[in-house]
């Protein structure tokens, strides 16, 4: 039996010790995806769709190429394993050995090249893929986030949420916001597409959470046009994109979305607190969204409204495998997180 490239993940009502007597947070646990993050949805969808209708001339099976320092590469590797496809992932030298082993264990060939993702990506596209094409193979380039077919796959998260709310007899007007972390804007774009398809994009505001040091969306919004970050300094490395997808930037103002930027210290504190409370280890990219569960005043301030007992906020816990608990403790110690 063929494996699926993604799973329907639970949407769980969770109570947070945040000073409120009742919790209105429903958390969507994307860490339970085959690749450990939401990226299994979109990247898996791109690979499956391309495998059915190959993008380039050639013969034989589709050869998949991904450049990533972590989660996107793991998503590509696990998706390819489910379809019995060859997968090559180029990672920069900064990638943790543990993450390299994870990607290799999922069946991919891993090449370490370059000091950052840009150099790894350049090597992948202009050297490895060129060599493969010369051998007559059908090739697919998998960008970590900036691809409409990937967004289409990510949009299934909205369909699931609507279905799960219905199963729990929760009416959509009770949902006051949907919170997600933003790096390059892949997840955000998928959520917007899913909400729009279900005629909810103008009814449910999306709160985009970033960390200072890789807050490319917020900086672009302040300038009024997309910017490119010269340096990416946040501990939330999975959010470290030098640019925001143009669709994400354009959709933000079109649909009245909200932007929140958090410090590394706040996000790390939340990751450790969440691990203590729920025995779930989340990396900082995921902890950024969960931070609002512990600090609902941030949410009420950005939405400019009170959230009442009967209201609901959806949190996308995007997942990710880039940090262990020990990594979180070490980073917290370095940044003097109390």
From Swiss-Prot:
Protein name, as recorded: L-serine dehydratase
Enzyme Commission (EC) number: 4.3.1.17
Cofactor(s) in the UniProt record: pyridoxal 5'-phosphate
GO BP, sorted A to Z: gluconeogenesis; isoleucine biosynthetic process; L-serine catabolic process; threonine catabolic process
Chain positions with N6-(pyridoxal phosphate)lysine modification: 39
Transmembrane regions listed in the UniProt entry: none
Gene Ontology terms: cellular component: cytoplasm
Organism per entry: Saccharomyces cerevisiae
This protein's record includes keyword Ion transport: no
Keywords: Cytoplasm, Gluconeogenesis, Lyase, Pyridoxal phosphate
An MF annotation (GO) of this entry: pyridoxal phosphate binding
PANTHER family assigned: CATABOLIC L-SERINE_THREONINE DEHYDRATASE, THREONINE DEHYDRATASE, MITOCHONDRIAL-RELATED
Keyword Lyase: yes
Pfam families listed in its UniProt record: PALP
Top EC category: lyase
């Amino acid at each position: 039996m063929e494996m699926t490239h993604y799973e329907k993940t639970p949407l769980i009502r969770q109570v947070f010790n945040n000073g409120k007597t009742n919790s209105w947070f429903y958390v969507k646990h994307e860490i339970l995806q085959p690749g450990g993050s939401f990226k299994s949805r979109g990247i898996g969808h791109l690979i499956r769709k391309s495998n059915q209708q190959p993008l380039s001339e050639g013969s034989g099976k589709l050869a998949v190429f991904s450049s990533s320092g972590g989660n996107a590469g793991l998503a590509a590797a696990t998706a390819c394993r489910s379809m019995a496809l060859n997968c090559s992932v180029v990672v920069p030298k900064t990638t943790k050995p543990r993450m390299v082993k994870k990607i290799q264990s999922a069946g991919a060939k891993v090449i370490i090249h370059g000091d950052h993702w840009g150099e790894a990506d350049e090597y992948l596209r202009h050297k490895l893929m060129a060599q493969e094409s010369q051998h007559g193979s059908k090739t697919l380039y998998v960008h970590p986030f900036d691809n409409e077919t990937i967004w289409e796959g990510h949009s299934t998260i909205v369909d699931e949420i609507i279905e799960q709310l219905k199963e729990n007899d929760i009416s959509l007007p009770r949902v006051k916001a949907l919170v997600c972390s933003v790096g390059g804007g892949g997840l955000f774009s998928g959520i917007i597409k899913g909400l729009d398809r279900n005629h909810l994009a103008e009814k449910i505001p999306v709160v985009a959470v970033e960390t200072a040091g890789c807050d490319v969306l917020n900086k672009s919004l302040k300038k009024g046009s997309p910017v490119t970050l010269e340096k990416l300094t946040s501990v939330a490395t999975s959010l470290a994109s030098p640019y925001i997808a143009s669709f994400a930037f354009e959709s933000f103002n079109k649909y009245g979305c909200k932007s929140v930027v958090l410090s590394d210290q706040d996000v790390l504190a939340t990751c450790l607190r969440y691990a203590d409370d729920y025995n779930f280890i989340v990396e900082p990219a995921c902890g950024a969204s969960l931070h609002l569960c512990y600090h609902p005043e941030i949410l009420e301030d950005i939405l400019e409204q009170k959230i009442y007992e009967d209201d609901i906020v959806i949190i996308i816990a995007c997942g990710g495998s880039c940090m262990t608990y020990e990594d979180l403790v070490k980073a917290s110690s370095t940044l003097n997180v109390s």
